[in-house]
A protein has these predicted regions:
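N-terminal nucleotide-binding beta1-loop-alpha1 segment
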Residues: 1-19
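Conserved N-terminal catalytic core of the sugar/cofactor nucleotidyltransferase
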Residues: 2-5, 26-106, 110, 115-117, ...
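Hydrophobic packing residues within well-ordered alpha-helices of enzyme cores
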Residues: 14, 60-64, 228
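A structural signal for short hydrophobic beta-strand segments in well-ordered beta-sheet cores
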Residues: 25, 144-147, 198, 209
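Catalytic-core segments of class I nucleotidyltransferases/pyrophosphorylases
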Residues: 101-103, 110, 116-123, 136-139, ...
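A short, conserved acidic/glycine-rich loop-to-beta-strand motif
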Residues: 125-135
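Structural signal for interior beta-strand "rungs" in well-ordered beta-sheet cores
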Residues: 239-336
Length: 336
């Protein structure tokens, strides 16, 4: 089985973290998001993945120079200009010569889904396209999918008012497509698979969806990226767990580190770190307290950082108190 993974976005929702690294290359539990995603696809029987690349493709090629990740063969398809989701899928699939049933995955989604079950369901229904769905407590912020008894998609409802949604099932960002679906996507144009292609297929009765209760998270917002990291510390994930402190990190013996991840080459003085992620090279000086935050930059001595995101150039002065802040500001950062 072959797959296309969409990794060409700008990562604007995760700025300033994505000012220096593409979103799918950010680590979750010391391992890049894209590597965790490809590993799960490989567990499900996917043997070849084409990365649909856009802005700044170089970090992906440099990370996997031999064209292999977790035993899965990689192909790099760099779109000449932003083509949105459907446009990128067609470009990448044709670049890779895909001419049979294939899988598509959004590059910022982490899930324990067994994709082979989605493929089996797709083939049993004779579908042209199949969407993986997950249930959420409040679907009003999402596009909701209404199904018939066989799993055929009847309609989409975008961001329904509270209490009016036909279901609590939302698009979870993994699909199975027939190669024939590519012909519904205009070449060389910006086309959304969610807003343009799927409604076309649904109108002909060829769009199906399967809901599962597998672990699933969209890592595209800071609070969810933080949660994805903390999830691999416990028993939330079926397969993926990690050690809290990377062996290449330097942590003062008197530091208090609770339910947090300390990345490679991070330095922590006699500080307190709770429910937080310190990424590669982050520095937290003695006396500082960091809670519910993601840190790439430097936190000065005796500073307090809560519910904040510090990019690579983010600096908190000694003694400064920070809460609910992104530094540098997202507007000042150039996303990838």
């Amino acid at each position: 089985m072959r797959a296309v993974v969409l990794v060409g976005g700008f990562g604007t929702r995760l700025r300033p973290l994505t000012a220096t690294i593409p979103k799918p290359m950010l680590p979750v539990g010391h391992v890049p998001i894209i590597e965790r995603l490809v590993t799960n696809l490989g567990r499900s029987g996917v043997t070849d993945v084409t990365l649909a690349l856009g802005f700044k493709p170089e970090p992906f090629v440099e990370a996997f120079p031999d064209g292999e990740c977790a035993g899965v063969t990689l192909c790099y398809a760099v779109e000449p200009e932003p083509l949105d989701t459907a446009g990128a899928i067609r470009f990448a699939a044709e670049f890779a010569g895909i001419d049979d049933t294939f899988v598509v995955a959004n590059g910022d989604i982490l899930t324990d889904l067994d994709v082979s079950e989605l493929v089996r369901f797709h083939r049993e229904r004779g579908a042209q396209a199949t969407i993986h769905l997950v249930g959420v407590p409040d679907p009003s912020a999402f596009g909701v999918v209404a199904l018939d008894a066989q799993g055929r998609v009847e309609r989409f409802v975008e961001k329904p008012a509270p209490g009016t949604a036909p279901s609590n099932l939302i698009n979870a960002g993994t699909y199975v497509l027939e190669a024939s679906a590519l012909q519904l996507i205009p070449t060389g144009q910006k086309v959304s698979i969610e807003r343009a292609t799927f409604p076309l297929i649904a109108a002909e009765g060829g769009l199906f969806a399967l809901a599962t209760d597998d672990y699933w998270i969209d890592t595209g917002r800071p609070e969810l990226y933080l949660q994805a990291n903390l999830d691999v510390l416990g028993d939330t994930r079926r397969h993926d767990r990690c050690v809290a402190v990377h062996p290449d990190a330097v942590v003062d013996p008197s530091a208090v580190v609770e339910h947090s991840i300390i990345g490679a080459r991070a330095q922590v003085g006699a500080a307190v770190i709770r429910n937080s992620v310190l990424l590669h090279g982050a520095v937290v000086e003695a006396g500082a307290v960091v809670t519910d935050s993601v840190v790439m930059g430097r936190v000065g001595a005796n500073a307090v950082v809560h519910d904040s995101v510090l990019g690579a150039d983010g600096v908190v002065a000694p003694g400064e108190h920070l809460s609910g802040v992104r530094r540098p500001s997202p507007d000042a950062a150039t996303g990838t």
